[in-house]
Amino acid sequence: MAHRCLLLWSRGGCRRGLPPLLVPRGCLGPDRRPCLRTLYQYATVQTASSRRSLLRDVIAAYQRFCSRPPKGFEKYFPNGKNGKKASEPKEAVGEKKEPQPSGPQPSGGAGGGGGKRRGKKEDSHWWSRFQKGDFPWDDKDFRMYFLWTALFWGGVMIYFVFKSSGREITWKDFVNNYLSKGVVDRLEVVNKRFVRVTFTPGKTPVDGQYVWFNIGSVDTFERNLETLQQELGIEGENRVPVVYIAESDGSFLLSMLPTVLIIAFLLYTIRRGPAGIGRTGRGMGGLFSVGETTAKVLKDEIDVKFKDVAGCEEAKLEIMEFVNFLKNPKQYQDLGAKIPKGAILTGPPGTGKTLLAKATAGEANVPFITVSGSEFLEMFVGVGPARVRDLFALARKNAPCILFIDEIDAVGRKRGRGNFGGQSEQENTLNQLLVEMDGFNTTTNVVILAGTNRPDILDPALLRPGRFDRQIFIGPPDIKGRASIFKVHLRPLKLDSALEKDKLARKLASLTPGFSGADVANVCNEAALIAARHLSDAINEKHFEQAIERVIGGLEKKTQVLQPEEKKTVAYHEAGHAVAGWYLEHADPLLKVSIIPRGKGLGYAQYLPKEQYLYTKEQLLDRMCMTLGGRVSEEIFFGRITTGAQDDLRKVTQSAYAQIVQFGMNEKVGQISFDLPRQGDMVLEKPYSEATARMIDDEVRILISDAYRRTVALLTEKKADVEKVALLLLEKEVLDKNDMVQLLGPRPFTEKSTYEEFVEGTGSLDEDTSLPEGLQDWNKEREKEEKKEKEKEEPLNEKVVS
């Protein structure tokens, strides 16, 4: 700035002369021309330099502005978002880059793939993350926006709370206190809703607030004001002027706030939606992501191992072999074998299909993708096929992997049962599933497992080899399998010190014929709950017996009130069952009989069925007679029958129809077999004629009548025994096998009751859990193991040579 002032002075722009302080010493004489010339030259040089500096700054700013890449195109510019910045140091010549780790990145967990399906969190803008349902509180910009928004709306609220709103008066107060006293300067009609009174200078009220009053309509106000001023004698220029103004008091902002909040909530809900909850980072969510799969990618997140699965060793071997296919394919490819595409696990509920899949996920050491069959179908058309495509695309990205579809019958039902909307969508989803499993776009290194307990309703195209090469049936465990399952579930329990786990597991296995793995787990859990209920320090054998009774018979109802006559009827009914079974050769051995109500029944009898898979006609007939023993006992001792035998009659009827319709055990109907309808199935037509149906009904009635007459004859002969058992039941309420032996003597037929007797002749006491030689290292990659062994052997060989 100084050199500019000097230049201005030297050109005559300053008439007052050069300030003395700016003149060098020795130049204050009369001849100041050399000094002025020096100063002029200095000022000229400095001005030119400043102009060049200013121009240089402008050009540099323009270049920086032009070099900034457009938003969204940063990666196409060398110094853009992905390019190397000028401030970053260049790599030295000859310096080698460190290799990037090629190992598998950590999975995002069970939320649908995690890191495999999303970008880095720090690279994403906070608004994009907020759209995807992620609340970006860790973002600095988001916190600043949130803070300023909160301050803005807080200021608005404070403004409206503390804003002076004046003092409201009535029309009468306005006339008497203000207009009649001549203190009104003018009236302002605001928004045609109220009138603000402006006072003449010096006449303002003491409180300093303005006053206002409401008006109904402008016309009425003007008419009343005109009449009032005439009455008060206010004429001409002295009349109060009326001004009409329109003001915005900001109340519309508050009125719009609920609407804005509702719209924001709806947009957030639509973008995230039910399908997007817990799946942040997978697209926009909600309606915009219905075509995305809801599958979960699991790896090293399941605690269930194969040691926790028992009672289905054959199925375990099959699943281990599938994992071995993925880990060591060379073992099979060298022999020309192809890796199977998949396997479907079938069997009754509770036998361990899903548990086996969980164990596979826990030990496979490959990505495990799980999805439910019902997750493919939604209310939108086309969602099912889209999710199937996305599911298999996810599987290909994670190959080699295992894909598990639980309850596949939800999407794999047979086609051709009508062309309704839902059925058509289900068929389209099934068609897409068939194409993805074995079509032109065949997946590689992806093993597909599926589970269902209704294989009879699956489409045949789904079950053919090439899609599901193997069908693995997992049935209820036998006595050895139950013993193994009990050992697994007894492991974490605190048992009494006098109990041995192996012996206890075998005894419980012999007491629970027909139990599935889920039933066994329930028994162990119930025993622990019963022990805790009684504040026991450990679980003893009595607790397990009570748990078995709880699972079989239901909850014991000791407080249920029975009339003495009803209790007596129940006692004779249960005594009839017990005595009939005691003297019938093929009936199941009795363990316990009780007249304490359990579940829906008023009495309870526990038997020990034999562990067998084939039944003769004589065995089925003896079981029918034992079941009818309760009704026969009522008729013999009371001369009447009650409704208590309804469940017994239902079981007898089912057994009779099964013998005649399914098993071909009737000479008149012949050696034929028809499928009986399942409970709850709609039967439109029978597979046989009306004449055959009439014949079947007649033979069923004859068979049941013969069994009833046989039971009547037996209990009439053993009437005294029935009465002894009934009287003791009324006295003790619960009888076990020892009580029956004391009353009736030993049972006249041989029977099996211990674990060792049941497994006699089967080769061993426990189930065979040995693995074939090819599956000894089923969970290890042999090539890597061999390389490690060679690397260990090489240094040893070098030492030996040296």
From Swiss-Prot:
Residue numbers covered by the propeptide annotation in the UniProt entry: 39-66
Annotated GO CC locations: m-AAA complex; mitochondrial inner membrane; mitochondrion
Name of protein: Mitochondrial inner membrane m-AAA protease component AFG3L2
Disease tied to this protein: Defects in Afg3l2 are the cause of the paralyze (par) phenotype, a spontaneous mutant strain. Par mice have a normal appearance and fertility but are significantly smaller than their littermates at 1 week of age and display a rapidly progressive loss of motor function in all limbs by 12-14 days. As the disease progresses, they lose the ability to support their own weight or turn themselves over when placed on their back and exhibit a typical posture with over extension of all limbs and uncoordinated movements. They rarely survive beyond 16 days of age, when they are completely paralyzed.
NCBIfam families recorded: FtsH_fam
Keyword Cell membrane assigned: no
Summary of subunit composition and partner proteins: Homohexamer. Forms heterohexamers with SPG7 and AFG3L1. The m-AAA protease is either composed of homohexamers of AFG3L2 or heterohexamers of AFG3L1, AFG3L2 and/or SPG7. Interacts with MAIP1. Interacts with DNAJC19. Interacts with PHB2.
Binding-site residues for ATP, renumbered to this chain: 309-310, 351-355, 489
Family to which the UniProt record says this protein belongs: In the N-terminal section; belongs to the AAA ATPase family.
Effect of residue 665 to R: Knockin heterozygous mice develop normally but adult mice show signs of cerebellar ataxia
Reactions mediated catalytically: ATP + H2O = ADP + phosphate + H(+)
